[in-house]
Curated annotation (Swiss-Prot):
Record-given protein name: RNA-binding protein 42
Its job: Binds (via the RRM domain) to the 3' untranslated region (UTR) of p21 mRNA.
Annotated signal sequence range: none
Chain positions with Asymmetric dimethylarginine modification: R151, R156, R166, R179
Keywords: Acetylation, Cytoplasm, Methylation, Nucleus, Phosphoprotein, RNA-binding
Region described as Disordered: spans on this chain: 1-33, 171-209, 317-354
Single annotated GO MF: mRNA binding
Any one GO biological process: negative regulation of mRNA splicing, via spliceosome
Organism: Rattus norvegicus
Length: 478
């Protein structure tokens, strides 16, 4: 049978070694087989990957030469030859990405293109054949361009090689292994100060706060549709979700979240619960304030996870704390308050105890408490040459016709009680003081005319005497 086939020549529609494809009956020359189209598509994708990475195209054939007839029917399609990546390539890519992120941190140009191309990982031969048509390819690129309008290019790598994707997917199954490139957090200098506490497991987002989408296991799961790549986009939150997506995810996750948020409180033995703390857990000193008599619920925004975890201690410190009730006195004690006259007497009594009127004359000093009976700001007149019959009432009656008259007193001997022949009269108004000095001088009070002089009682006070002595020493008189 083989000789018959050899004698008959090449089969129609199959390529001959070193020659062109022989078209079969009813088959046009411009038509291509599925294998050739698959090879061209893989070569085009490999070239696109190399262009994105910026490396020269090496070792990738554009097309595979024709295969003999018998072998083409039995051998499966040859795989695409990919370049061998060295062991240090991962670190070099990381350093390159960090350098680009640091350079773009100062100036962030708007990203015009669509999301980065992930590659044909996870596609079967049947899926690849469907993407060959121009309609499917145009629809796929239009869909990518419409999904993500603009994203900051500094927050994730532009392209991830397939070998690194397979290596990361194999290592992510072990605990503590590195996360995929697209799921890694951005550079530390772009996010802000690091959170205190040990680092947590990869992506500590609770199920209710995570946006609906494919699982976060490996890059192979991020196949089209590419609506929401799991990369951080908002530096203000430091998470992979925006405010709108996070709120929708929280509302759709649990219907009883509103009831649970009212019961969440920080008390003597509690800490902020629920999705309030996202990422590494806060220290106990920040997450748990001082115990209060009555705990207050946290704001609803913190419970929903709409605020970053670093602002939770600030909110806890700004909460209004209940003041202890003031002890109210019994009703009977309200009438026992100290009245104002008692307060005035108390104020006057204090200076009286501290104030001492020390007099000095002829080299001797003594205390005269009788001066405390007079007003310190009055205008005082000395009345001399008084008769023995003149007392305080007679002297006051003589000067009482002046409106601002205050007090009149005759000085007597303490031991015998006899008058010393002089006294004092005080006025509040200086005009009355001047009138009394002019009108009453030489008038009869009792059986004798009185003599009026300006009172010099202040000149014998100890403080005044010392002040005058200092002034005389300065002038050089003594």
């Amino acid at each position: 049978m083989a000789s018959a086939m050899a004698g008959a020549g090449p089969a129609p529609g199959l390529p001959v070694a070193g020659g062109p494809v022989v078209p079969g009956p009813g088959v046009g020359i411009p038509g291509k087989s599925g294998e050739e189209r698959l090879k061209e598509m893989e070569a085009e994708m490999a070239l696109f990957e190399q262009e994105v990475l910026g490396a020269p195209v090496t070792g990738i054939p554009t097309a595979v030469p024709a295969v003999p007839t018998v072998e083409a029917m039995q051998v499966p399609p040859a795989p695409v030859i990919r370049p061998i990546i060295a062991t240090n390539t991962y670190q070099q890519v990381q350093q390159t990405l960090e350098a680009r992120a640091a350079a773009a941190a100062t100036v962030v140009p708007p990203m015009v293109g669509g999301p980065p191309f992930v590659g044909p990982v996870g596609f079967g031969p049947a899926d690849r054949s469907h993407l060959d048509s121009p309609e499917a390819r145009e629809a796929m690129f239009l869909r990518r361009a419409a999904v993500a309008p603009q994203r900051a290019p500094i927050l994730r790598p532009a392209f991830v090689p397939h070998v690194l994707q397979r290596a990361d997917s194999a290592l992510s199954s072990a605990a503590g292994g590195p996360r995929p490139m697209a799921l890694r957090p951005p550079h530390q200098a772009l996010v802000g100060p690091p959170l205190p506490g040990p680092p947590g497991p990869p992506m500590m987002l609770p199920p209710m706060a995570r946006a609906p989408g494919p699982p976060l296991g490996s890059m192979a799961a991020l196949r089209p549709p590419l609506e929401e790549p799991a990369a951080p986009r908002d530096l203000g939150l430091g998470l992979g979700l925006g405010l709108k997506e996070k709120e929708e995810a929280v509302v759709a996750a649990a219907a009883g979240l509103e009831e649970a948020s009212a019961a969440v409180a920080v008390g003597a033995g509690g800490a902020p619960a629920g999705p309030a703390v996202i990422g590494p857990s806060l220290p106990l000193a920040l997450a748990m304030p001082l115990p209060e008599p009555e705990p207050l619920p946290l704001p609803l925004e913190v419970v929903r996870g709409l605020l970053p975890p670093l602002r939770i201690p600030e909110l806890l410190s700004l909460r209004p704390r209940p003041r202890p009730p003031r002890p109210e006195p019994p009703p009977g004690l309200m009438a026992l308050e100290v009245p104002e006259p008692l307060g005035e007497d108390k104020k006057k009594g204090k200076p009286e105890k501290l104030k001492r009127c020390i007099r000095t004359a002829a080299g001797s000093s003594w205390e005269d408490p009788s001066l405390l009976e007079w007003d310190a700001d009055d205008f005082r007149i000395f009345c001399g040459d008084l008769g023995n019959e003149v007392n305080d009432d007679i002297l006051a009656r003589a000067f009482s016709r002046f409106p601002s008259f205050l007090k009149a007193k005759v000085i007597r001997d303490k031991r015998t009680g006899k008058t010393k022949g002089y006294g004092f009269v005080s006025f509040k108004d200086p005009s009355d003081y001047v009138r009394a000095m002019r009108e009453m001088n030489g008038k009869y009070v009792g059986s004798r005319p009185i003599k009026l002089r300006k009172s010099m009682w202040k000149d014998r006070n100890l403080d005044v005497v010392r002040k005058k002595q200092k002034e005389k020493k300065k002038l050089g008189l003594r």
